[in-house]
Every structure is written in C-alpha cells, then in structure tokens.
Amino acid sequence: MHRITATSIFALLLTPFVALTSGQAFAQDAAAGEQVFKKCMTCHRIGPGAKNAVGPEQNDLIGRQAGTVPGFAYSPLNKASGEAGLIWNEDTIFAYLPDPNAFLINFLKEKGKPDLAKGSTKMAFKLTSEQERKDVIAYLKKFSPSK
C-alpha cells in the first residue's frame, strides 16, 4: 500500500510538468504562421525569388544580423541595432514584433548606445498576439533552413 501511495503521489506531481512541456512542444504551428504571415505580406516577401518590398525579404531571417539584407534601405535605428549586435532568433523576433520601435530603442540602450536609440524603424505594424508570434516564427523558420 505504501508503494502505491508513493507512486500515485509521484504521478500527481509529474502530471502538470508533462502537460506543460508537451504543450510547449506544440506551441508553434507553421501552417497557422503562414496564415499570420499574410498580414506581413503588405510589406514583406518570403520564399523562392522573394525580393525586398516596403520591408526586407524574410528568407534566412533566423540567425541574420539586423539591418543587413542587401539592397534594402533600413532606418538608422535598425542599422544601429544590427551594428550593436542584434541577431534575429526566436527570442528577439518574439520580443520585436509587438512593438518594433520600443524593442530596438531598448536594445540599443541595453548595449550602452543610448545616443543611437532614437528615431524609428520603418515597421509600423505590431503583432501583439503571443500565439500568432509563435506561429509566424515557426513559419519563418521554414525559410531559414540552416538554423
């Protein structure tokens, strides 16, 4: 009886952990992200043959230094962030999308470059939904095969 009780207690303690970690494994949905990216297509392109538009093309975004897509005229704020070491990864994209200007300004201040933390990025769109951000990142990862 004592053994069953200990096993039962262990199972009860483990259940929330399993539920949380299995949810994280499925938290990103690239198919849903493709639908979310349609909002981004007002300015951005992705996929074979994508070219810069109002915003830079998004191929190979994961792992790229900010402000470095050839042929795109970035804002000084965006270029300064890249020069200060901003690399696009899941975490930085997730933090950037709800408020691009605030993210870049804070990034530069944290890097000790408050004199460069002025102006604005060209990206006026804000993606505030956490799930949509996770999903669009999963979609972007499909076009960053080396990452």
Regions found by a protein language model. Name each.
Residues M1-T7:
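N-terminal secretory signal peptides that target proteins for export/translocation
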Residues C40-C43:
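Short cysteine clusters
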Residues S8-T21:
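Bacterial N-terminal signal peptides
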Residues Q35, N52-M123, V136:
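Extracytoplasmic electron-transfer domains, predominantly the class I c-type cytochrome c fold
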